[in-house]
Amino acid sequence: MAGSNGQNEGVENWEAQLRKGCLEMAVLAALAPGKSYGLEIIRTLEMHSKLVLSEGTIYPILNRLRQDSLVDAVWVESDSGHPRKYYSLTRKGRERAAQMAESWMEFAQGLSSLMEPLLSKKRGARV
């Protein structure tokens, strides 16, 4: 993503909006392999997508996904004695995640072909 000088402020704002728009899809995708708790979801997203989320961001998203019947949640005792709330996709959540993934891939492929000339020019300028 963009650097942090004043010249890139507009790009940074755009990137922040892009991340916000993708969070629900990213959380559903992070839950696709199986059940997970909040901090684990945060780590998964950071590792795979460079999305850095706080607990104050992830839990409202998870609650909204629960209200929309896209995820289920269950409290489970952990080895440390502190219960953890594990989230998993519902059937509806799996269907929604698959639809979002398909739409995203089509969108990203189209944009990639559109952006390629811009990237080629930038690469050529570095040589």
Regions picked out by a protein language model, each given a short descriptive name:
Residues 1-23, 100:
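Intrinsically disordered, low-complexity serine/threonine- and proline-rich regulatory segments
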Residues 73:
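Short beta-strand "wing" residues that participate in macromolecule-binding interfaces
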Residues 59-66:
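Short, hydrophobic-biased segments on the C-terminal half of alpha helices
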